[in-house]
Design a protein with these regions (language model features):
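Short phosphate-binding loop-to-helix
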Residues: 5-7, 15, 21-67, 75-79, ...
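Short active-site oxyanion
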Residues: 10-15, 94, 170-171
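Short, high-confidence coil segments that cap the C-terminus of an alpha-helix
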Residues: 11, 61-63, 90-94
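A structural signal for isolated positions on well-ordered beta-strands in alpha/beta enzyme cores
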Residues: 13-15, 67, 96, 163
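Short beta-strand scaffold positions
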Residues: 16-18, 145, 175
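Short beta-strand/turn micro-motifs composed of small residues
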Residues: 18-19, 70, 99
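Conserved core of the sugar-phosphate nucleotidyltransferase
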Residues: 50, 74-161, 166
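Catalytic donor-sugar/metal-binding loop of nucleotide-sugar-dependent glycosyltransferases
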Residues: 151-173, 178-193
Length: 193
């Protein structure tokens, strides 16, 4: 799905980093290159940032826009990708990520240190009505956009200049387990009929 979504969004140079021999052996279109992921970066515990820093260092030689589309977000659409690219193009961001609005009551939460409740945000939010709290967004992992040189020099996604492209709850479903896969599959079948 990620390849088709990227192509539909107008992305002309697509790299796939994988350890799957099935994907590596597939005859991809000219604009798609499958690259063997080094074994030490092909574990379930490997952070995505390590895979990306290796990819930009060895396979993306010049500064260009990088759009990361994780395969675990199959309900993302081409218009989401184009929208996020537009946010990046018209902002002054180091990175743009897709996100979904979440329950505002998270602003009422805190950390327990000894017997002390330390609010995670402004103390007055703990005692505010939920509906009066500001909107809260959570990165959904569907889209990351950044320049190759920024990631190469930063070696991290950490930044104070993060742009946001909002996606719906339905489009933000992420596959983490078999139940998620079944829900995504049902949504795709419903959408395609």
């Amino acid at each position: 799905h990620a390849i088709k979504q990227a192509q539909a969004a107008g992305i002309s140079d697509i790299l796939i980093s994988t350890d799957s021999s099935e994907i590596l052996d597939t005859n991809h279109a000219n604009s798609v290159r499958a690259i063997k992921r080094p074994d030490h970066l092909a574990t379930d515990a490997t952070p995505m940032i390590e895979v990306l820093t290796d990819l930009v260092a060895h396979h993306i030689p010049d500064d260009r826009l990088v759009v990361l589309l994780q395969p675990t977000s199959p309900l993302r659409r081409a218009d989401h990708i184009r929208g996020a690219m537009d946010v990046y193009a018209h902002g002054t961001f180091d990175i743009v990520v897709s996100a979904v609005e979440m329950d505002r009551s998270i602003l009422k939460a805190g950390l327990l240190v000894g017997n002390t409740f330390n609010p995670i945000n402004k103390p007055e939010y703990v005692f505010s009505n939920r509906q009066s709290l500001p909107p809260v967004y959570k990165h959904n992992g569907a889209i990351y956009i950044f320049s190759r040189d920024w990631l190469h020099s930063n070696q991290s996604f950490d930044s104070d200049r993060i742009g946001l492209f909002e996606m719906s709850v339905a489009a933000s479903l992420d596959i983490d387990n078999a139940d998620d896969f079944a829900r995504c599959e049902a949504e795709i079948l419903k959408r395609d009929t």
